[in-house]
């Protein structure tokens, strides 16, 4: 099987790397090197030039997002699930994303939408949109699902830091789910008030904390480090 240009995770004993299989090339780490021509299947194990065993496999969404090259701060995987559920995104959705950023959330939304969905992603920075386009095509090219045919990237500023300003020149008149991802509580107060004033119901404000546990035999304990506050998720629903 030809794995040319296949996006993969190469996992050594100490680190994970995101790479693309390229015929005739080698992947070099401080634990040795491997030849991409030796990759015959996925997943598989390969012995490096120093005798170390490397695992090679297709990246999950979480692995890809955390290891990819990025510009602006990403929305972390722990928050993505809550955002998608709050927005009720499915294969028939029409989605407007304000603030493309590095494309982490854009990617996951795109993977959920169907061929008849509509998806518009706005950003004032064209570099962000170019980066996001590469991010999405690079990840989804690993698969062949019936995902959305096209994402329409629009170069426009709708004030990501002040989402309440959206309602100054726009009016919601169809059933709509709204989700904002914000770093500060002062922003949360303003957008929640604005949603209330513009007819939104079921307004929720939450933040997601993620703490892993270690389980070894009869001993169980939480890990000493955890992923705490990364942003507030504010959601609401406009019902006619």
Predicted regions and their residues:
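C-terminal substrate-binding/active-site "lid" region of AdoMet-derived donor-dependent transferases
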Residues: 167-232
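Conserved SAM-binding loop and adjacent beta-strand
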Residues: 67-80
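Glycine-rich helix-loop-beta junction characteristic of Rossmann-like nucleotide cofactor-binding loops
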Residues: 85-90, 112, 170-171
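N-terminal auxiliary segments of SAM/dcSAM-dependent transferases
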Residues: 1-58
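Short beta-strand element of Class I
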Residues: 116-120
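Conserved class I S-adenosyl-L-methionine
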Residues: 90-101
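S-adenosyl-L-methionine
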Residues: 122-164
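Conserved SAM-binding loop of SAM-dependent methyltransferases across substrates and taxa
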Residues: 102-115
């Amino acid at each position: 099987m030809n794995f040319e240009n296949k996006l993969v995770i190469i996992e050594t004993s100490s680190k994970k790397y995101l790479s693309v299989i390229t015929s005739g090339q080698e992947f070099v780490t401080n634990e040795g090197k491997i030849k991409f021509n030796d990759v015959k299947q996925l997943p598989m194990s390969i012995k490096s030039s120093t005798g170390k065993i490397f695992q090679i496999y297709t990246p999950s969404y979480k692995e890809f997002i955390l290891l990819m090259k990025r510009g602006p701060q990403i929305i972390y995987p722990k928050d993505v699930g809550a955002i998608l559920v709050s927005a009720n995104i499915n294969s028939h959705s029409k989605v407007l994303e304000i603030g493309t950023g590095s494309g982490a959330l854009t990617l996951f939304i795109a993977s959920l939408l169907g061929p008849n969905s509509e998806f518009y992603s706005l950003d004032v920075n064209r570099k962000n949109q170019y980066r996001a386009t590469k991010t999405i095509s690079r990840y989804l090219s690993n698969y062949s699902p019936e995902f959305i045919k096209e994402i329409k990237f629009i170069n426009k500023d709708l004030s990501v830091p002040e989402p309440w300003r959206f309602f100054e020149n726009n009016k919601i008149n169809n059933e709509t789910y709204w989700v904002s991802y914000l770093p500060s509580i002062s922003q949360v107060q303003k957008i929640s008030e604005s949603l209330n004033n513009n007819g939104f119901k079921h307004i929720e404000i939450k933040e997601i904390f993620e703490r892993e546990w270690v389980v070894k035999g009869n001993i169980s304990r939480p890990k000493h480090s955890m992923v705490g506050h990364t942003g507030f998720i504010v959601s609401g629903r406009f019902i006619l």
